[in-house]
Each structure stands twice: as structure tokens, then as C-alpha cells.
Amino acid sequence: MLEKTCLEEKLDQQCSNVDNIKHTNVDIFKNESNSTVVSIPPKHSIRARKPSLHFLHSFASSGSLTYKNALRHKSCKLHLHKCKNPKKKYRQSGFRLASKGIPRSRCSKKAKKYLEDKKLMPISEVSLDPVISSNPLLRWWATSASNDSLLEELNNRFEQITNAWVQVSKDEAQNFVHKTEYTKGDHCEAASPLETCLLELEVSPVKMLFQKKYNLNELCTWFMQTTETQSLSLVRKANARNPLEVISTKGIKLGVKCCGFNASPFRKHFKKFAVSSPSKPAGKFHILHKMVGSPLLNVKSNLTLARLKRTEFKNLHCERWRREERPYSHRTVDWSSKRRNLRLFCQNPSWTNSEGQTNAETSLNGKGTVGNQWASPPEPRVTFAKKRVAVHDFRTHASLESKFNGTGGGQTDSEKEQIMESVSSHNWRSKTLKDCRIFLRKINCLEHRNTFKLNTIIYSPESVDSGGSQAQPEESKRFSLRSHSARQNSFKKQNEERANPKANSPASSRLTGELDSSHLSKHVNFDKNPDHSEALSKLSKRKRPPWKTTEMSAKRHKRQSCNSGQMANYCTKSQVGKLFSPSF
């Protein structure tokens, strides 16, 4: 619609321009009739005012089919009208000039000049011919024409084209042969080799296509049958594909047996195109997961699964078995879960509070604090009975401490037991106990080597030197837990104390007598034997096994750190068992 409106506007502009030219010419001739001198306009201005033939040709050919005929008629009318106008004007001007009594010679001269000027403009001669010739071969159909009429006209044209071709049917070929023989007999014409070749063709394929109705499917089938469409690259890609994607497992019989992957029909293709074949295609595992629950898995002689049953299918079955077994299995926890539990164990506020309270309580017992050493047992599993024994041992030691320390110690021990029981009853399980053992084993690198005596306690020099009534009962209580080097040091210090009778009290002498009767009778009686230095040297010169030497070096390191005042807090095995024991 926009094109139509534009064309109409252009035509109106051209027509208005032509009318303006007419009016200007009429006014000029009127003025000339009034005046004696005829003013003829210049050539270029007149040519510029008139529409050009190139514009009309392009304008007529650019429109739609329905508007071409209208443009052709309009262009013809315009040119004919322009040709008639100058003739009429010339006659009118000549008639007016003659009527006014102007001499004939002057009129004739002016008329000749005007005609010469008009001869320079050939548009009047060209405009007589139409812009678009009405050729009967070119036919334009309107948009309202039906499809049936168009098909009929097309069929007629195809028939005309086919009739113009050389006929190659049998009857026509025989007639053509007779004609050639007749011409040869007369020796007038000779048969051309092209015509003899046409005789050999019975039916032309192009003629066959145009004689029948147009059908795209027939053309496609004919093209696919008569041409080579598969290239080498397509065949190579098809061979390099995964057999799981190409072959469907539905049509495989159960009785078919395959020797193996090396004897399979795909072996040569995988060897030939090993670079182009993908190692792990995208849809491979998706197909395998779909086929896990199918009955074809039980068939060991499957063609497509012969190669995959060694690796992928075993893994898939193992995954299924693990998923089914996981809620019923009672196996050890992974190290990641242990680390997670250990982190929670270290961040637990109840554990930190209990640890601070135990350290405070041990500091109240005397000037020298008994170190709390975290000792991890070497065995991976500790039964419930062992935990109870450790807790009972801790309680007996706590009762002994309360006897010698007085009422304050008893109160602290009772508070400690209540706190420990609350912690153990609410917060600890067997898993956390195992995780804590692993954690303690990694922290205590020195105690990790000591697999025999993990419950040893080394006293600080202040606690050993204290001559009160608290240190000696603790020594009598925990004397059996000391190592050999610690015993030697304690014997030396006890002998020094006995040599000074002023410093020793009667209670301490009684306790030392009990200690001599109970513990020192097995080794050497240092009170009766004056040569105690010789006995100590003999004990030190004994031959020790290699594990004992490593243990002694560790103990020596601890003793040096204890003497320098850098000893860390330690706790015994019984205390650790008390902390992690479940509620009774």
C-alpha cells in the first residue's frame, strides 16, 4: 500500500509540473501577442521542466504487475498531449499575428526561428512510441486469478516447450530413419552425427520429468538413487562411534555367544580410527545406568556388554550393594567424620570448663601442682570393663588425697566427681572416645613411643622438695607409677631428708617406714645398707634392652624440662578414662 501511494504521489507531481508548463507557455504566447517581440524560452529550461524518459521507464518497471498497464497508458497520454500542445500554440500565435496586421515577412522569419528551436528537442518524436511495448508473449496475471487457471497456463506452456523438442519415440525415430535414407539416396543431404546419437536415446530423462506432474518426493528419490551421497568422512564417523550408541540391545538374542572384545566386529574400526573414537562418550554412563536393572545383565554372553562388564558394570553393582548395605553396616567411621567429631569435641564448652576446673583443683592440693598428662593407650579398642577399672582407680587415688589433704580436698574431689559424671553422662560416646584417643596420640609424640608405662607422673622440683605432710603420702600413693630414673631421684632425696633429722617430722618418719616396708623391700634396703651409692651405681650399670634406652632418653628429656620449670600439665590414664567413661 505504501508503494502504491508513493507512485500515485509521484504521478500527481509530474502531472502538476506538466500543467504548470502549459500555463507558462500560454502566458508567454499571450504576452507575445500583446507585444510585437516574441520571447522564446531557452532550451535547457524547457528540457528540465519536462519529465525524462529514463524516469518513466524505471517508474513503469518498478511497480507491481497491476500498475504497469496504467503507467504505460498514462505515459503515452502525456507524450501525445505534449506533442499536440506546441502545434496548437504555433497555429494560435500565427493566426493572432496575422490578424494584427504584422507584415508577412517578419512573421515568417520568427516562425522559422521557432521551428528551428523546436527541431532541437527530439522528445516529441520519441514520445509517440509507448514506454512499455504490449508484447503478446509477456502476460501478466492479476492477483485475483485462481490457482487452477495459473496451472492450466503453465501446463500449456510446458506442452509448447516439449513439443518444440526433438521427438525420440519409436514411431518418430523410424520416420526419421526413412527420411535420412531418402536423403542419402538422392545424395542431397547427409545425416549429422548429432542426429544419429539422438536415435540411440529412447527416452530423455529431462523430458520424463516435464511430461509428468511435479512431485518433490519423486525427484528426491531419483536423485538419491542415481548419485553418490555418502562421502568417506561420513562413513568414517559412523565407524568411529561407540557401539552402545549405534546398536540397540533389544534385538540381541540370548543364545548368541561372543568370544570377546578382540574378536568382536568393532575391533578393526576401533584400531583404524582410534584417534577419532571418543574414550568416554557423554551418553555412555547414562545408558549404563538405565541398563543396570534390565534382565540382560544376567546374560554373560552379551555382545555389547562383553567389554564393559569387566570395569563399569562391576563398579555399578558395587555401588548398588553399598547403598543397600550402608544403613545396616557397623564399620569404623572414616577419617573425615573422625576429624569432624574431633573438632566438635575440642570446641565443646563443657570440656573446656571441666579441664579448667581440674587444673584449678590440682593447684589447690599444695605448692607444687601435679601435672596432668594426656596419655593415649596403644590399643585401638578399650572395653567397658577397662574404663570402669580406670575410673575406680581414679576414685581410690582421690580418696587417698582427701585423707591427707583434709576437708578442702574432699570437697574438691566430690565436686570433681559430680562434674565428671555430668560430662561423661551427657556428652561422650564410644565414637568420640576413639576420636579423642587418635587426637591425643597425634599430640603426644613422646608418649607414642612409650608402649609399656603410659601412666608415669614426674613431679616438679617444688613438690619433691616440699617437706610437708602432703607430698609424702602422694609419693607413697603413686610410687608404683614411677619409672626407674624417677625412683632413683626419689631415693636420693629421701636419704638426704633422713640425714637431716631436724627437718623430718614424726609423721613423715612413720610414712617413710611404711614406704620402706611395702615398696622398698623388693629392691634394696637403703636405710640399713650404708653403701647406697654403690647399689645405685649397680642399678645404673645394668644392661638395658634397646626399647628401654629410647624410653630412658624420653624420660631424661622430661626430667630436664621439669628441673628447668618448663614442664607442661599432664594427667594420668585413670583421669582420661574417668573423663570419657559413660554414665553408670
Curated annotation (Swiss-Prot):
Residues 353-375, 502-511 have a biased composition (Polar residues). Signal peptide: none annotated. Residues 353-379, 400-426, 463-565 are annotated as: Disordered. It holds the Pfam family DUF4553. Residues 516-535 have a biased composition (Basic and acidic residues). This is Putative uncharacterized protein ENSP00000382790 homolog. It comes from Mus musculus. The lineage of its organism: Eukaryota, Metazoa, Chordata, Craniata, Vertebrata.
